[in-house]
Amino acid sequence: MIDADGFRPNVGIILTNHQGQLLWARRVGGQDAWQFPQGGINAHESPEQALYRELHEEVGLYPQDVEILACTRGWLRYRLPHRLVRHNSLPLCVGQKQKWFLLRLLSDDARVCLENGGRAEFDDWRWVSYWYPLGKVVAFKRDVYRRALRELSLAHAQLENSNRKELSRG
């Protein structure tokens, strides 16, 4: 499902643990390409439905394993480099338009599983600090990551503050 401008609708997933760290995953393929989980929105599927489907396909988690904390307001777009555009495909896809979700992990991180019946997207993952991905993601996605992280940073900071309060009471 590609829009009239050539952008494929997509969801991006920023998953945070109770320490405020983000799940950062390495793509299969051996090029040391790390990113947040993401995936396309199918026809007749809402962004939230796509989020939960992709969450399970890519990292093995279910809706009950997470809580949605925030979502970007509009679509964030990036263009694919010319070498990655499939010029012989119709309709032509020139990039992605994404809704980004910030999720809190409610379950133990041992539930993260990268092999879920289909072709695995990732072969490794780790927890990283909130702004770490900006210096590591592939260049053509960097602006979208910056905009998503900036827009979702208030919700993330509020979660970190509530976690600190719980620990100090504990």
UniProtKB/Swiss-Prot annotation:
CDD domains: NUDIX_Ap4A_hydrolase_plant_like. GO terms for molecular function: mRNA 5'-diphosphatase activity. Keywords: Hydrolase. A motif (Nudix box) lies at residues 39-60. It comes from the Bacteria. Disulfide bonds: none annotated. GO terms for cellular component: cytoplasm. Its cofactor is a divalent metal cation. One of its GO terms (biological process) is mRNA catabolic process. Its EC number is 3.6.1.-. InterPro entries: Nudix_hydrolase, NUDIX_hydrolase-like_dom_sf, NUDIX_hydrolase_CS, NUDIX_hydrolase_dom, RppH. Coiled coil: none annotated. Residues 6-150 form the Nudix hydrolase domain. NCBIfam families: PRK00714.1-1 (NF001934), PRK00714.1-4 (NF001937), PRK00714.1-5 (NF001938). Accelerates the degradation of transcripts by removing pyrophosphate from the 5'-end of triphosphorylated RNA, leading to a more labile monophosphorylated state that can stimulate subsequent ribonuclease cleavage. Belongs to the Nudix hydrolase family. RppH subfamily. HAMAP family: Nudix_RppH. This is RNA pyrophosphohydrolase. The gene is rppH.
